[in-house]
């Protein structure tokens, strides 16, 4: 596994969906992460970038969909998602647009 020096190379983007917005109310945030990163690296990156306390990290490797084109079949790239749960006394992450009500 290659070493990743900058924590911003681990977190690629927030996942914006109905399910991820529903989890925000429970203190769980969803991110697209680098496929080679592990749970410890993800935890350290979130704590450094956002200044919060992470209690748990769950990861999921997602297969890219097979899509049909006029020249045959292609495939979207595989992605890795991380569901990061913050501690109860931690401040919310504002990258998702604030509170959902």
From Swiss-Prot:
User: What one GO molecular function would you report for this record?
Assistant: rRNA binding
- Provide this UniProt record's keywords sorted from A to Z: Ribonucleoprotein, Ribosomal protein, RNA-binding, rRNA-binding
Which residue windows are coiled coil? none
Q: Name one GO biological process term.
A: translation
The family database entries (Pfam families) matched by this protein are listed as: Ribosomal_L23 (PF00276)
Return the GO cellular component terms, semicolon-separated. Answer: ribonucleoprotein complex; ribosome
**Family statement drawn from the similarity comment of this UniProt entry:** Belongs to the universal ribosomal protein uL23 family.
User: Mind telling me which HAMAP family this protein's record contains?
Assistant: Ribosomal_uL23_B
User: NCBIfam families this protein is in?
Assistant: PRK05738.2-4, PRK05738.2-5
Function noted in UniProt: One of the early assembly proteins it binds 23S rRNA. One of the proteins that surrounds the polypeptide exit tunnel on the outside of the ribosome. Forms the main docking site for trigger factor binding to the ribosome.
How this chain assembles, per its entry, is: Part of the 50S ribosomal subunit. Contacts protein L29, and trigger factor when it is bound to the ribosome.
The name on file for this protein is Large ribosomal subunit protein uL23
Q: From which organism does this entry originate?
A: Rhodococcus opacus (strain B4)
The gene name reads rplW
